[in-house]
Design a protein with these regions (language model features):
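Conserved alpha-helical substructure of the radical SAM core
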Residues: 31-38, 78-172
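Accessory C-terminal segments flanking Radical SAM cores
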Residues: 1-92, 96, 107-110, 133
């Protein structure tokens, strides 16, 4: 396995609850077009996003063993001795499917699509991005600790408020 390989770029598509395409659930970075505009499900097809310039560039970087900044969470996990999501088989098969420009003719075999964070549970392994109940709890803690609240907003990406009135920012 090359140090930067992740099978998700060959078999998985992730759509954040904001409607933005991302490489996977472990990154906060949105997939963007060549002008730096994020690709959104309302304006972009799955097919075009799957072989967008950014995705093709990242696939080629992975084939060449170059680091990908969007994948820093998994790299950090691995450096601590944990197995990350990107550690997977099929590297040679996926590399063989990749054209010289980084595109592939096969579509993803899995998709993760989130419509919001409305959830009546507060599972310990989850976060405010996926549970408004956890979000309400964190907002309560943040009333007395503004630094904590600023950190939570930064970590949550596009989610503004985690109350029963879900507010998600849609920037197209």
């Amino acid at each position: 396995m090359t140090k930067s390989y992740c099978a998700k770029l060959w078999n998985h598509q992730y759509i954040h609850m904001s409607g933005s395409f991302r490489l996977c659930c472990a990154t906060m970075d949105n997939v963007e077009d060549s002008n730096g505009n994020r690709l959104h499900i309302n304006n972009n097809s799955l097919e075009n996003t799957w072989n967008s310039d950014q995705i093709k560039d990242i696939r080629l970087k992975m084939i060449n063993g170059e680091s990908v900044s969007s994948c820093s969470k998994c790299v950090e996990q691995e450096s601590r001795g944990y197995k990350s999501m990107r550690e997977s088989q099929d590297m040679e098969k996926n590399f063989a499917l990749t054209k010289q420009d980084g595109s592939v003719d096969v579509m993803p075999t899995t998709m993760e699509l989130h419509f919001g964070n409305l959830c009546n549970l507060k599972c310990k392994m989850c976060g405010q991005q996926y549970s408004n109940q956890i979000g309400k709890e964190l907002l309560e803690i943040g009333k007395n600790d503004k630094d904590f609240l600023n950190w939570i907003y930064k970590e949550s990406g596009n989610v503004n408020i985690w109350t029963n009135n879900l507010s998600v920012e849609y920037k197209c």
